[in-house]
Amino acid sequence: MASIHADVTLVGGGIMSATLAMLIHRLDPALHICMIEQLPDIALESSGALNNAGTGHAGYCELNYTPHDKDGNVLIQRALEINAAFEVSLQFWSHLVNADRENITPSSFINRVPHLSAVWGQKDIDFLKARYTLLKSHHLFSEMKWSEDEQTLADWMPLMMKGRQAEPKLAATRVEHGADVNFGALTRILVSYLQKNANFELLTNTRVVDLHRAHGAKKPWAVKVKNQNSAAKQTIESPFVFLGAGGVALHLLQNSGIEEAAGYGGFPVSGQWLICQNQDLIRQHHAKVYSLAAVGAPPMSVPHLDTRIINGKPSLLFGPYAGFTTKFLKHGSPFDLAKSVRPHNLKSLIGAGKNNFDLTKYLVKEVFQTHSQRMQSLEAFIPNARAEDWQLAHAGKRVQIIKRCHHKWGKLEFGTEIVAAEDGSLAALLGASPGASVSVKTMLDVLERCFPQQMQSAEWQDKLKTMIPSYGRSLINDANLSASVRRYTLDTLKLSS
C-alpha cells in the first residue's frame, strides 16, 4: 500500500475544509495540504447551493437566534455573536477578492438580498417589536428598519402582500444589506485557487476507510483511503487531520479513538424545498423573509421565502420542510444513524431520544406531508400561491449534536461544535446552523486550538490582521471598528444599496 505525507489532511470537500485550507495556505504556503472528498467533485453535499438556505446568516432575520428567557425577555446575545462572526467571514472574502480581482468577482458567490423578519398576529408582533427595539439600539443592527404600514410592507415584499387580508395584522423588520451566498460556488473558487499551488492536492472519489495513529500516541495520523473508481488504496500520514465531512465527521471522529469523542452522537434531520417555477413570481420577490417556527418544530425548520442567486440567475425557494431520516449525508447510507451507535454514546442517545420524543414525532409526521399540505404553509407567505407554480426538491441533511448531560443522560443541541484532541492533532466539526456563514470564524477557532504557538507568532498575527482587520478585537464592543469594517466589506463585496 502506497504511503504519502501531508502536513495537513482535510476530510471533506465542502466550505469548511476549503476555508481552513485557504487560511492555512495564506498563513504558511510551505505546508502541504491534502483534501479528500468521497464524491466525484467538491461541494456536492451541504455546501451545494440547493442543499442549504444560502442565507448569509447574520442574525438579522433569523428569529430563533433571539429567544425568550423564562421571564419573557428577548435575548439578543446570540444574534450579536452570529452577526460579528459573519462580519469576520465578510472580511476574509473581501481580502480574497482584493488579492485576486482578475479571477474572483463578488457576484459569483455573494449578492445583496435584503433580510426581513415577518410575523402576523398581535402576540408575535409584540415579540418582533421587542426584538427590533433591543437590536436597533446596538451598533451592529442600527440600520434595521421596522414597519406595520401596509404600503411600506408592499414595497418591501410585494408578492407576500398581494391578495392578503387585513387580518391578521402583519409587521416586519428589514436590513437592506443582507446577503445571499452561494457556498458551493465559493468552495469551488477557494479550491480552484489552491489547486494552482504545488503544495495542495485534491483527491476526489476517495473514501477514508480507516483513521488511527500511525505508530501510537504523539505520532502522525494514518489516514487510509480508497479510490472508489480504481479500488487503489493508500495511506496519508499527517500530523494534523481535520474532519469536515458533514454528518459523516461523527463516524470518523468515533473511529479516531480520541477520548474527547466519548458521548457524542448525531440526530439527522432531512430538508425539502418548494422551488418556484414561475418566472413572473420570481421577479416580484427580492428578499429573504423569515418567520417563526411552528410549535414543536426544530430551529432549522423556521419557514422562509428566499430569493437565491444561483449561477447568476434569480430563484425563489420556500421551506425548508424538515423531516426524519437515518442518513447523515444526502448521498449517505440509511444505516448511518445505526452505525453511529457506540457503547460510549448509548446513554446520551437514549437520554436525548427520551427528552425529544415530541420532536421525533413531529419530524416523522412532516415526512408524510402531501403537496397540498406543504402549499398550506406557503399560503401563509403568499396568499395567492398556486400548487402548479411550485416543485418539491430535496435539500441536504443536517446532523444535530447529541452529547452527554448529567441531569438528563443526554441532550440535543442545535448549533455547531468543534471537538478536538487534547494535543491539537485532530479536530472535527459537528452540528449545523449557522454553519457555512460563520465558516471563517469557526476555522480560526480550529487554528487557535490546534496551532496555538503559530497563531501567537508575530508572522501569523500580522498576516491574520491583514486578512481580517478586526482579528483579535471585538466588533460587538467597538462601534467605530464595526463601522469601519462594515464600510470596507459592503463596498468590496458590492453589498451596498
Swiss-Prot record:
It catalyses: (S)-malate + a quinone = a quinol + oxaloacetate. Pathway: Carbohydrate metabolism; tricarboxylic acid cycle; oxaloacetate from (S)-malate (quinone route): step 1/1. It is an enzyme of class 1 (oxidoreductase). InterPro entries: FAD/NAD-bd_sf (IPR036188), MQO (IPR006231). Its EC number is 1.1.5.4. GO terms for molecular function: 2-hydroxyglutarate dehydrogenase activity; L-malate dehydrogenase (quinone) activity. GO terms for biological process: tricarboxylic acid cycle. The keyword Flavoprotein applies. Coiled coil: none annotated. Keywords: FAD, Flavoprotein, Oxidoreductase, Tricarboxylic acid cycle. Its cofactor is FAD. Gene3D superfamilies: D-Amino Acid Oxidase, subunit A, domain 2, FAD/NAD(P)-binding domain. The keyword Oxidoreductase applies. Belongs to the MQO family. HAMAP family: MQO (MF_00212). This is Probable malate:quinone oxidoreductase. The lineage of its organism: Bacteria, Pseudomonadati, Pseudomonadota, Gammaproteobacteria, Aeromonadales. The gene is mqo.
